[in-house]
């Protein structure tokens, strides 16, 4: 995306539609948008060139697994039902690793989502009657780039939507879909970036997690690197996922070292670093911004999973995390009665509250998602089946599940995303296919 031929568009909040972006000298071809649930738009070959190494061997009967039996989340009838209304396939035929709806749009605005895979970033708009309209497509100048993750935010001055993307080359790119330009990029990680997340309350604070074993916190308004989380007691292998809690005071990270680590960003040291990142002005000083190096997490455990931990999300003060063991585990640091904000780094207890069981999902880098209100949880497996759990239950053990299948969807579903109003669920697959499921009211 270094050389760019960009058609200019007036700055407004409506995204220019159906523009093909040449972010390189390559011809950018249009994703194949033919197809609905009844035609043959989707083939069922699984993509082979995933650029992700093999999953380590899964050991279902590993010692110590018995303690999990007490919290099995039996599937009962779920009150949510969905219908597959459309599918399409991007023409690069490479795995789509990430999908995200823009939750920052205003009510009444069209529902826009982005997909990432190969060296392509594509924006779509959902319309009634199942229509998915191509808005824009961006191609990286480097044919070897493989985007793994994307995250939406907005410009706090202009309110323009912004999309951050990153992948195998370890470069974060910020795209403004209104001006249709890649407006900034950040280089710092020594290897691939596996996940990007924006702070829930500050649209400028971007978290990135990497194959280089570290997490980085960036301020995209002042282009500063606020902090690096990793080192002495950090992750010992690739960091695969991380999430902010609802208030943006804590980060939970997880990775290939089987561990989950808690990092507080509401400490005096971190609050001060964030403030200083806003005050920093390179035009008024010769000194570079000093990033914090956080070597010690505020809590760490390897007692939840026995394999790569590839997805983690906060649910209130509880944690949802998964490995390639066919279960999402719900747990909390410390004992049941402990306050999460008073947990000490030396704490060795964890409390497992239950688990969501499913099947045929023992490859890694398969990520679950929740809707905006955290009432639904969705995960796809490696044979194209979608699981949706109803989280609105008093006892987590009673979480009900519905399974969504389509006879033409047979490739691994890498990620799912709900629209902000929960009316649409999008799933993206290893064969470059995109599936739209609409909720039946």
Swiss-Prot record:
Q: Which residues carry this modification: N6,N6,N6-trimethyllysine?
A: 66, 197, 268, 284
What effect on the protein does mutating residue 236 to T have, as reported in its record?
A: In COGIS; decreased trimethylation of 'Lys-27' of histone H3; no effect on interaction with EZH2
Its recorded name reads Polycomb protein EED
Q: In which tissues is it expressed?
A: Expressed in brain, colon, heart, kidney, liver, lung, muscle, ovary, peripheral blood leukocytes, pancreas, placenta, prostate, spleen, small intestine, testis, thymus and uterus. Appears to be overexpressed in breast and colon cancer.
Q: Mutating residue 364 to A: effect?
A: Abolishes binding to H3K27me3
Mind telling me which PANTHER family this protein's record contains?
POLYCOMB PROTEIN
Q: Which UniProt keywords apply?
A: Acetylation, Chromatin regulator, Chromosome, Disease variant, Host-virus interaction, Methylation, Nucleus, Phosphoprotein, Repeat, Repressor, Transcription, Transcription regulation, WD repeat
Q: Which residues carry this modification: N-acetylserine?
A: 2
- Quaternary data: Component of the PRC2/EED-EZH2 complex, which includes EED, EZH2, SUZ12, RBBP4 and RBBP7 and possibly AEBP2. The minimum components required for methyltransferase activity of the PRC2/EED-EZH2 complex are EED, EZH2 and SUZ12. Component of the PRC2/EED-EZH1 complex, which includes EED, EZH1, SUZ12, RBBP4 and AEBP2. The PRC2 complex may also interact with DNMT1, DNMT3A, DNMT3B and PHF1 via the EZH2 subunit and with SIRT1 via the SUZ12 subunit. Interacts with HDAC, HDAC2, histone H1 and YY1. May interact with ITGA4, ITGAE and ITGB7. Interacts with CDYL. Interacts with BMAL1.
Q: Which GO terms describe its molecular function?
A: chromatin binding; enzyme activator activity; identical protein binding; methylated histone binding; transcription corepressor binding
Provide the function of this protein.
Answer: Polycomb group (PcG) protein. Component of the PRC2/EED-EZH2 complex, which methylates 'Lys-9' and 'Lys-27' of histone H3, leading to transcriptional repression of the affected target gene. Also recognizes 'Lys-26' trimethylated histone H1 with the effect of inhibiting PRC2 complex methyltransferase activity on nucleosomal histone H3 'Lys-27', whereas H3 'Lys-27' recognition has the opposite effect, enabling the propagation of this repressive mark. The PRC2/EED-EZH2 complex may also serve as a recruiting platform for DNA methyltransferases, thereby linking two epigenetic repression systems.
Disease tied to this entry: Cohen-Gibson syndrome: An autosomal dominant overgrowth disorder characterized by accelerated osseous maturation, advanced bone age, skeletal abnormalities including flaring of the metaphyses of the long bones, large hands with long fingers and camptodactyly, scoliosis, cervical spine anomalies, dysmorphic facial features, and variable intellectual disability.
Positions of post-translational Phosphoserine modification = 2, 34
The reply on keyword Membrane is: no
Q: Which family does it belong to?
A: Belongs to the WD repeat ESC family.
Give the main location: nucleus
N6-methyllysine, modified sites? 66, 197, 268, 284
Q: Quick one: effect of changing residue 97 to A?
A: Abolishes binding to H3K27me3
Q: Where is the composition biased (Polar residues)?
A: 45-61
User: GO annotations under biological process?
Assistant: cellular response to leukemia inhibitory factor; facultative heterochromatin formation; genomic imprinting; heterochromatin formation; negative regulation of DNA-templated transcription; negative regulation of transcription by RNA polymerase II; oligodendrocyte differentiation; regulation of adaxial/abaxial pattern formation
Entry comment on modification after translation: Methylated. Binding to histone H1 'Lys-26' promotes mono-, di-, and trimethylation of internal lysines.
**Subcellular location, in the record's words?**
Nucleus; Chromosome
Q: Which residues carry this modification: Phosphothreonine?
A: 55
Which Gene3D superfamilies is this protein grouped with? YVTN repeat-like/Quinoprotein amine dehydrogenase
**What InterPro entries does the record tag this protein with?**
PcG_WD-repeat, WD40/YVTN_repeat-like_dom_sf, WD40_repeat_CS, WD40_repeat_dom_sf, WD40_rpt
């Amino acid at each position: 995306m270094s050389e760019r031929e960009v058609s200019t568009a007036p700055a407004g909040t409506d995204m220019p539609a159906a523009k093909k972006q040449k972010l390189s000298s390559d011809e950018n071809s249009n994703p194949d948008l033919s197809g609905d649930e009844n035609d043959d738009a989707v083939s069922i070959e699984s993509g082979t060139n995933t650029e992700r190494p093999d999953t380590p061997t899964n050991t279902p009967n590993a010692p110590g697994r018995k303690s999990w039996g007490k919290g099995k989340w039996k599937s009962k009838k779920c009150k949510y039902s969905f219908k597959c209304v459309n599918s399409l396939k991007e023409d690069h035929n490479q795995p789509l690793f990430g999908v995200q709806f823009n939750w920052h749009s205003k009510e009444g605005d069209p529902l826009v989502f982005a997909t990432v895979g190969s060296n392509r970033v594509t924006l779509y708009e959902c319309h009634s009657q199942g229509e998915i309209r191509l808005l824009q497509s961006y191609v990286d100048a480097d044919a070897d780039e493989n985007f793994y993750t994307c995250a939406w935010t907005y410009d706090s001055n202009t309110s323009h939507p912004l999309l951050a993307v990153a992948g195998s080359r370890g470069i974060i790119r910020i795209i403004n879909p209104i001006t249709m330009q890649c407006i900034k990029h950040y280089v710092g990680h020594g290897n691939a970036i596996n996940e990007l997340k924006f702070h829930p309350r500050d649209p400028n604070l971007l978290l990135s997690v990497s194959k280089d074993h570290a997490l980085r916190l960036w301020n995209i308004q002042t282009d500063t690197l606020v902090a690096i989380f990793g080192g002495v007691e950090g992750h010992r292998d690739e960091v695969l996922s991380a999430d902010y809690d609802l208030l943006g005071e804590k980060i939970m990270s997880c990775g290939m070292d089987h561990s989950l680590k808690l990092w507080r960003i509401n400490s005096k040291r971190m609050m001060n670093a964030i403030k200083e990142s806003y005050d920093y002005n390179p035009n008024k000083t010769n000194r570079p911004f000093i990033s914090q190096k956080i070597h010690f997490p505020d809590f760490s455990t390897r007692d939840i999973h026995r394999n790569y931990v590839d997805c983690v999300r906060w649910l209130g003060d509880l944690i949802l995390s998964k490995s390639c063991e066919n279960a999402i585990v719900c747990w909390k640091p410390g004992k049941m009665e402990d306050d999460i904000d008073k947990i000490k780094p030396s704490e060795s207890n964890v409390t497992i509250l239950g688990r969501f069981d499913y099947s045929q999902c023992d490859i890694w880098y398969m990520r679950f998602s929740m809707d905006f209100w955290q009432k639904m949880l969705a995960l796809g497996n490696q044979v194209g089946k979608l699981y949706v759990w109803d989280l609105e239950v008093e006892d987590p053990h009673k979480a009900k599940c519905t399974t969504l299948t389509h006879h033409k969807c047979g490739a691994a579903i890498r990620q799912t995303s709900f629209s902000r109003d929960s009316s649409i669920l999008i799933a993206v697959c290893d064969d470059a296919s995109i599936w739209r499921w609409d909720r039946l009211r």
